[in-house]
Amino acid sequence: MSGLPDLRNQFFFPRFSSLPLDAGFLTLYDDSDDDFIAFDKSKPRFQNRSPRKHWCIFAEIVQENRWPIRPVYQVKDLSGRQSLVSFNFDDRSLFADVARKCKVGYTLCIMYAERHQFADGNEGVRVEQPDAVKVLPVSLRELLATSDVFRASIKANHASTDTAACSNCYKPAAHRCSRCSLSEYCSKECQTQHWAKKHKKDCQVLRQLKLWNAFDWHRYDVRRGMNDFV
């Protein structure tokens, strides 16, 4: 069944402590992460893992750690636990985009994240694929609030035939935002005001929520990537 689950649902949006262990950890702990990963015993080690479902961790940036080799950030998840996120792209030219987009207070959304132990003993997430991560210009609290509004509006749109209200002044709406196709407005003036006041940030979040709403999180079919760095 397609549709975006509640972002507080830890089955699809786990906290760091619940993430599956990456291949490096599994050299220390031969553990099967049944909720996330299926293991094929007939294949060689490190080539025998495939996702059972889609999942994504949300991590708000609290500090930039200045490493000379790659971008590394101190982050917190929805439980408040802090850990590291390291960007390990093969294409190092993308690191300038990472530095430009990743700001303290913004939220990293990392698909298919796994727990990694770094050489210094710290734990975190190692992001190797550019399409695995999305940077949203909102805090975790703002992300949850926008998601709640989005999910409520999807249900309301299915149930109601009433004319939608302008997102700025609440008069009857005449057109939608061309970017997210979700926020509605009675006039160009109201749309311009709302963009400057709130929607510039919300629009990016709503577009991502809309993409996540289009597939079934319970069943892994194809890799669901994101386009910030691809």
Predicted features and spans:
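Short alpha-helical interaction motifs and adjacent low-complexity tails used for partner binding
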Residues: 1-230
